[in-house]
Amino acid sequence: MARAGPAWLLLAIWVVLPSWLSSAKVSSLIERISDPKDLKKLLRTRNNVLVLYSKSEVAAENHLRLLSTVAQAVKGQGTICWVDCGDAESRKLCKKMKVDLSPKDKKVELFHYQDGAFHTEYNRAVTFKSIVAFLKDPKGPPLWEEDPGAKDVVHLDSEKDFRRLLKKEEKPLLIMFYAPWCSMCKRMMPHFQKAATQLRGHAVLAGMNVYSSEFENIKEEYSVRGFPTICYFEKGRFLFQYDNYGSTAEDIVEWLKNPQPPQPQVPETPWADEGGSVYHLTDEDFDQFVKEHSSVLVMFHAPWCGHCKKMKPEFEKAAEALHGEADSSGVLAAVDATVNKALAERFHISEFPTLKYFKNGEKYAVPVLRTKKKFLEWMQNPEAPPPPEPTWEEQQTSVLHLVGDNFRETLKKKKHTLVMFYAPWCPHCKKVIPHFTATADAFKDDRKIACAAVDCVKDKNQDLCQQEAVKGYPTFHYYHYGKFAEKYDSDRTELGFTNYIRALREGDHERLGKKKEEL
C-alpha cells in the first residue's frame, strides 16, 4: 500500500495535465465553439474569421499556442476560433463545415471566412508573421520570406531589426526597400534571392517592406522615392544606391564584385530641340498657329510614352514629305502635354499619343493613324472617321456587364460566376476579351453559370474594384452565390476558362449524386 499513493497521484497528474496546459496557453481572445448555431452567428457578425479545426485537444496544442499570440496582434482586426472535432459535441459542426480530418497525418485544418462565407483554406506558412499578415490582408500576396527560394535573403520587419543588422554586419550589405504591391519589385525578387544564394558567405542581401508610414524615417534617410530602392552598405555605412545597373542575378553578383555609384543617366533631348519638320507648339502659340495654317495634324505626346516614341519617326517622315511638297496639303505639329497642361486639359487629352486635326482653326476627330503612309493619306483627303467600334459593353454578348449598384444582387442569383475586372485601355484585357466572351457564350444556356465583367475605370465602379482588392488588370475572381471564393490564376484562354467552369459543374453533379445515394 505504501507504493499505491504515488502511482495514484501520478495517474491523476497525467489525466489533468493536458487540460491544465491548454487552459494556460490558450488566449481568452480565441473563441472555442462547438454549436453550429454559435458559429453561424459569429460568421454573420464578424467579417474576418480564422477557424482552427483539430482532431483532438492535444493535436491543437501547438497551433493554439501560436494562435494565442496572433490573436493579440490582430485584436480588433480579425477573430480566431477553435473547434475540437474530437469532442462529441463538436463533431456535428465539423461535418456540417465539411472538415475532413480522417487522414492519419492530418491533425488540424485552418479555414478562413470573410463577410459571412467561406473564403479559403489557409495554406501559407504556419508562422506568427505569416498568419498576422494574412489576417490583416486576407486577399493580399504572401510575404516574400514565405517563398522557399528566399531563404538566403535576410528579411527585416522593423526599424530595430534594420539598425541591428547595420551595426553587426561585417560583410558587404545590399538592402532592397520594397512595397508588397510593386510589380517591378515582384519581377526583381527572384533574381535578388538567387543572387543572395550565390553570394552566401561573401555578402548579405536583405529585403524590407517599407510601404507603411511607420518607416517614413528610413525612407527619408535613404531617399526612397519609389520601389524598389536598393541601397549598398559597408560596415554599417551607407555608400550609394544600386541604380541604373541590370536587374538579373548575374548583374547583381557581378556588381558586388566591384560596387560602384549609380551610373549617370544621359538626359533625353526634348523632341522640340531635335530639329526636323514637325512644328512644336505651346500653350502660348497654339491658337495663333492653327489660325495661320489651314490644315494641321497635331500629335499630343508625353516624353515617357513608349507608343509615342515608336510613332515619332513615322510622324517626322510624314512631316518632311509634306514640307517638300510644292503645293503642301498641310503641316504636322506636336504638343508635349506634360509641359503644356492647359492645352491637354482643354482638349481632354487622357492618353498618349492622341491626334487632333484642325481645319481653318476648327477641331475635327481623327481615326487611328500610326504610319507615314496613313498620315499622308489623311492629310491629302481629311474626312470624318468611321464611327468608332462599339465598346465591349455595347456589343451583344453573353457577358454580364456589372456596376457597383447591381454587382452583389446579380451575383447572388448565380451559383458560379467568374468575374473579369478590367480597364478598356489595358492591352492584356483587350487580348483576353474574345476568349472570355466565347466562354460566356458557351455557357449561356446554363442558368447557374455566368461570366461577368466590371469596368474599373468607371467612376461608379472604382469603390467596388477597391473593395474587391483589384490591383491590376485584368483580375479574375470566382464567386459562389455572390460570395468571393477564390482568385482565378490559370490560363487566360477560352480553354482555360471553360475547363475551370466545367470542373465547378462536375463538382455540383458529384455532390448531387452522393446526396441521391445517401437518400
Swiss-Prot record:
Q: Which organism is it from?
A: Homo sapiens
- Supply the EC number(s): 5.3.4.1
The question of whether Endoplasmic reticulum is a record keyword is answered with yes
What is the residue range of the signal peptide feature?
A: 1-21
Alphabetical keyword list? Disulfide bond, Endoplasmic reticulum, Isomerase, Redox-active center, Repeat, Signal
What are the annotated disulfide bridges?
A: C85-C94, C182-C185, C305-C308, C426-C429
Lineage top rank: taxon: Eukaryota
- The residue ranges of the Thioredoxin domain are 134-261, 270-384, 378-506
Root EC class: isomerase
Annotated catalysed reactions:
Catalyzes the rearrangement of -S-S- bonds in proteins
An annotated GO cellular component of this protein is: endoplasmic reticulum
Q: From which lineage does this chain's organism come?
A: Eukaryota, Metazoa, Chordata, Craniata, Vertebrata
The molecular function terms in GO held by this entry are: oxidoreductase activity; protein disulfide isomerase activity; protein-disulfide reductase activity
The cross-references to Gene3D superfamilies, in alphabetical order and at most eight, read:
Glutaredoxin (3.40.30.10)
- GO terms, biological process: electron transport chain; protein folding
UniProt subcellular location: Endoplasmic reticulum lumen
Instruction: Tell me which InterPro entries the record gives.
Output: PDI, PDI_a_PDIR, PDI_b_PDIR_N, Thioredoxin-like_sf, Thioredoxin_CS, Thioredoxin_domain
Q: How does it assemble?
A: Interacts with CALR (via P-domain).
Motif interval(s): Prevents secretion from ER: 516-519
Protein family: Belongs to the protein disulfide isomerase family.
Kindly provide the name given to this protein in its UniProt entry: Protein disulfide-isomerase A5
State a single Pfam family of this protein.
Thioredoxin
